[in-house]
């Protein structure tokens, strides 16, 4: 009986690792995201960039659609990218990425399991067109239609304030504990 239980636990663990290993995930082609993400590396180097930064950029595409993006690098801890692209009819996409630096294989696996659970929980209310988890980062792309422009602008107008919050937390040392835990290994 103990051998059977051990075998079942081993198989379940192996399946969990296989489902979310560093090179696996779900999703389709990468054409609708931030156009700066590779399915194997994300928008940041494997352990992030050296210095703290938070950049907000925006522009207009050739088709007239508007885009706005926030990109945050917290050295030795986390990177984050969020980009909305939408037209005058309220049709577009949201790209969302989180990268975690100096993570163990166990932490990467746990992150992907949580990510997959979150996708399942929200799949009935969001139209995911692309998803990925592996190599210490995850992203998803959501497509939408006919959203009110005021709602969309309110989402992206907060990016500048978000940068101020990230910078204040960085200067106040709010991330120091996480950084220390990850880099002592």
Task: Mark where each language-model region is.
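Positively charged n-region of N-terminal signal peptides that target proteins for export
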Residues: 1-4
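Bacterial signal peptide processing site
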Residues: 21-23
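C-terminal motif of bacterial Sec signal peptides marking the signal peptidase cleavage site
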Residues: 16-19
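Subset-of-secretome marker
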Residues: 44-185
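Sec-dependent N-terminal signal peptides
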Residues: 6-12
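N-terminal, intrinsically disordered, polar/charged segments of Gram-positive cell-envelope systems
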Residues: 25-43
